[in-house]
């Protein structure tokens, strides 16, 4: 696809403000990349799918702009299965071997897994160094690269070990979407749909109208979707950077979705397990069904959401082989829970999400059982 040369930017306000820049060709802009490195050391963290396409170009761009810059590189295996304490340790070792000081910078070149790992390593190395997010997937551009939530998974659950560490900048080169597999594009669109579902009915309607263009990779439609999604997230993160309240709304479908991901053993390139966006799509439908069962919303709203996700070729049902009891056990470990009670993001219809602090497990089990 061809992309407009116009650039869009979204400012994220707060104690540590930064800018999200959205445009084609940004990875070749060495001056822009290097401007965020305060010292003489940078670590480029990428994965086995992304690095062959873009890592050499990023390193060359940095070297042209800053010949004095020492750039290390770590390439991890692609997929959620790499988001572990062991891989995190490899990133820390890479920083140590580079001789990175407190003015070093970690560049996260990849999707959500790379962004989470790089951000967490940056948060921990010498108690915090800069991280610049270079998202190459739609999901990372609209969600995981923005807001400073970083984490790794453990066998007991997803994102249970992590830190809040806002990036120094988010630089989203939309040219990278050209090499994004169709399945990963659809996964990112699930997170885009989420923004309409939680707070923007007009955006929800726009997504329905533009669904064909988005699935076909239309540059203008994708740029609009990315910018609008980032605007929504930036507004929420600025008001609630540490997820003490409103920011939890961004997790619509995630408690159910994370349970599915964890119970399946996480998706990876080439396997049939749901990836993150697909699991969130199923989770949003489950959250909508639970909302209707609790009398919070109309069943027709649930069907409207399910139909839109289906139109984007996203799953809407729990994969076979996962029991309600096993999924509920995973949900009990969700970070949003308080005092051992399920705390879920539900809704009162399209654009009207809210946090429900004490949801009965029996009601959840009934939804999980179908």
From Swiss-Prot:
Enzyme class of the recorded protein, top EC level: lyase
Keyword Nucleotide-binding part of the UniProt annotation: yes
EC identifiers of the protein: 4.2.3.4
Residue sites binding Zn(2+) per the record: 191, 254, 276
Cofactor (UniProt): NAD(+); Co(2+); Zn(2+)
Predominant location: cytoplasm
Transmembrane segments: none
Cell compartments where the protein resides: Cytoplasm
Domain of life of the source: Bacteria
One Pfam family, short name: DHQS_C
Name under which the protein is recorded: 3-dehydroquinate synthase
Organism: Xanthomonas axonopodis pv. citri (strain 306)
Lineage of the organism: Bacteria, Pseudomonadati, Pseudomonadota, Gammaproteobacteria, Lysobacterales
Gene that encodes the chain: aroB
């Amino acid at each position: 696809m061809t992309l407009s040369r116009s650039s869009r930017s979204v400012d994220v306000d707060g104690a540590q403000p930064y800018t999200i820049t959205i445009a084609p060709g940004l990875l070749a802009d060495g001056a822009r990349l290097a401007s965020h490195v305060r010292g003489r050391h940078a670590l480029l963290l990428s994965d086995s799918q992304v690095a062959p396409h873009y890592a050499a170009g990023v390193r060359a761009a940095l070297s042209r702009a800053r010949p004095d810059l020492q750039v290390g590189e770590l390439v991890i295996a692609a997929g959620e299965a790499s988001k572990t304490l062991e891989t995190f340790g490899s990133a820390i070792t890479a920083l140590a071997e580079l001789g990175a000081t407190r003015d070093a910078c970690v560049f996260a070149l990849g999707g959500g897994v790379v962004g989470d790992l790089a951000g967490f390593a940056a948060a921990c190395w010498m108690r915090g160094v800069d991280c610049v997010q270079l998202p190459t997937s739609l999901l990372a551009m609209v969600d995981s690269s923005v807001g400073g939530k970083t984490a790794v998974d453990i066998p007991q659950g997803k994102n249970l070990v992590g830190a809040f560490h806002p990036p120094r900048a988010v630089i989203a080169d939309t040219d990278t979407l050209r090499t994004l597999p169709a399945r990963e594009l659809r996964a990112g669109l699930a997170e885009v749909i989420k923004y309409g579902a939680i707070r923007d009915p007009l955006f929800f309607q726009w997504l329905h109208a533009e669904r064909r263009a988005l699935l076909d990779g239309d540059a203008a439609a994708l740029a609009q979707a990315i910018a609008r999604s980032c605007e929504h997230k930036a507004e929420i993160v600025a008001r609630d950077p540490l997820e003490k309240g409103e920011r939890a709304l961004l997790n619509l479908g995630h408690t159910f979705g994370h349970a599915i991901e964890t119970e399946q053993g996480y998706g990876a390139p080439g396997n049939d397990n749901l990836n993150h966006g697909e699991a969130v799509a199923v989770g949003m439908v489950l959250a909508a069904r639970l909302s209707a069962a609790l009398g919070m919303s109309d069943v027709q709203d649930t069907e409207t959401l399910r139909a839109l996700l289906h139109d984007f070729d996203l799953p809407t049902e729990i994969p076979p082989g996962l029991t309600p009891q096993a999924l509920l056990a995973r949900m009990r470990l969700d970070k949003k829970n308080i005092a051992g009670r399920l705390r879920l993001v539900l809704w009162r219809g399209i654009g009207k999400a809210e946090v429900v602090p004490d949801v009965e497990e029996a009601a959840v089990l009934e939804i999980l059982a179908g």
